């Protein structure tokens, strides 16, 4: 598996930032989804304390590559397949945002479905393949990796990558600062069973808007 030392360091700093500022680990509204990340019991409001953990069996994207007949940039396995974690909030010179991570194996499989959908849409639009790693808080801006060279860009759904942020995913993550913020309890519309809270709702809305164009 390709290594992303910047992600390992960011996860460590993330936990440390919450302990130093709030004297507690980060909390997440997991909607009663089980995860190896959970620390202790759910609180009275339904949130859980969590800490990122290294997966016993790393997640791989071989099935996605086979389905699409496409070789994916190796960093996708290190970014999504090494840990179980809640989404990660950050501050940066480009603004604040979130990095997508996977909460459990079901979440990982749902992620794969979404990446397949994203890559199929890029092919349909005759655009170069990219895969998403998060979102910026500014409107509908996705953070995506150029699958050809591994660089990180801003991308609007339905458009080509527009603003280059870093030459590599490792470099991009090294430029982020953990953002300490209370957990957000989302009031969501009824969704299929595989839909997940938080950042997934934002991704769903972006793709719904794209398909509606």
UniProtKB/Swiss-Prot annotation:
GO terms for cellular component: cytoplasmic side of plasma membrane. Keywords: Cell inner membrane, Cell membrane, Membrane. Gene3D superfamilies: Syd protein. It is found in: Cell inner membrane. Its main location: membrane. The keyword Nucleus does not apply. InterPro entries: Syd, Syd_sf. NCBIfam families: PRK04968.1 (NF003439). Belongs to the Syd family. This is Protein Syd. The lineage of its organism: Bacteria, Pseudomonadati, Pseudomonadota, Gammaproteobacteria, Alteromonadales.
């Amino acid at each position: 598996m390709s290594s992303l030392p910047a992600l390992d360091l960011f996860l460590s700093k993330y936990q440390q930032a919450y302990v130093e500022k709030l004297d507690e680990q980060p909390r997440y509204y997991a909607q009663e989804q089980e995860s190896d990340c959970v620390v202790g019991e759910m609180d009275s409001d339904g949130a859980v304390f969590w800490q990122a953990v290294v997966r016993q069996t790393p997640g791989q994207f071989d099935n996605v590559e086979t389905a699409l007949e496409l070789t994916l940039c190796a960093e996708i396995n290190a970014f999504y397949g090494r840990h179980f974690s809640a989404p990660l909030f950050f501050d940066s010179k480009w603004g604040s945002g979130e990095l997508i991570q996977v909460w459990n194996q079901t979440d990982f499989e749902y992620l794969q479905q979404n990446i397949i959908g994203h890559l199929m849409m890029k092919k349909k639009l005759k655009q170069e393949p990219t895969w998403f790693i998060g979102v910026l808080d500014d409107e509908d801006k996705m953070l995506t990796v150029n699958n050809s060279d591994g660089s990180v860009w801003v991308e609007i759904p339905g458009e080509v990558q527009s603003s280059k942020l870093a030459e590599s995913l490792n470099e991009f993550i090294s430029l982020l600062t953990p953002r300490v913020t209370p957990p957000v309890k989302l009031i969501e519309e009824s969704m299929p069973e595989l839909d997940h809270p938080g950042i997934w709702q934002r991704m769903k809305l972006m793709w719904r808007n794209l398909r509606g164009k």
